[in-house]
């Protein structure tokens, strides 16, 4: 299984490590969908994060390596259920939640290069709106 992912978000490029040992099913499901193209918007309930709302999209995974408190640079996948399916990236303090209350998502991907641009991406998304994002090998 490939362990590194290139992420282009807005004008920034990041390198990220798949957490294959901690979230093998989530990583495999995500890899099968690469290249993955979407847009990020700023979170509404969770703090300093951006997210990809995915509605009823199914990755076919349950919970593994799940958390409500991702650290900056960590991506989590919420597989759906109480709220819609989503991918969230923390750029600052996050307490993952929706209007239904606290949620937990699978930490499956961690930025390892480009962290110095993470806060700028978050603030750009907050003040300028949706940004394109592409995940690829």
Place the predicted regions along the sequence by residue.
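Glycine-rich active-site loops that engage anionic ligands at enzyme catalytic sites
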Residues: 18-137
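N-terminal intrinsically disordered, low-complexity, charge/repeat-rich segments that act as generic
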Residues: 1-22
């Amino acid at each position: 299984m490939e362990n590194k992912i290139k992420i282009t978000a807005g004008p920034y490029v990041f390198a990220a490590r798949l957490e294959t040992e901690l979230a093998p099913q989530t990583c495999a499901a995500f890899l099968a969908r690469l290249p993955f193209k979407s847009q990020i918007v700023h979170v509404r309930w969770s703090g300093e994060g951006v997210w990809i709302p995915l509605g009823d999209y199914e990755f076919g995974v349950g919970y593994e390596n799940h958390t409500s408190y991702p650290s900056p640079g960590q991506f989590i996948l919420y597989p759906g259920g109480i709220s819609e399916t989503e991918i969230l990236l923390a750029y600052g303090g996050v307490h993952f939640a929706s209007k239904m209350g606290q949620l937990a998502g699978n930490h499956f991907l961690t930025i390892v290069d480009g962290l110095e641009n993470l806060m700028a991406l978050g603030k750009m998304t907050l003040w300028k709106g949706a940004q394109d994002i592409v995940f690829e090998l």
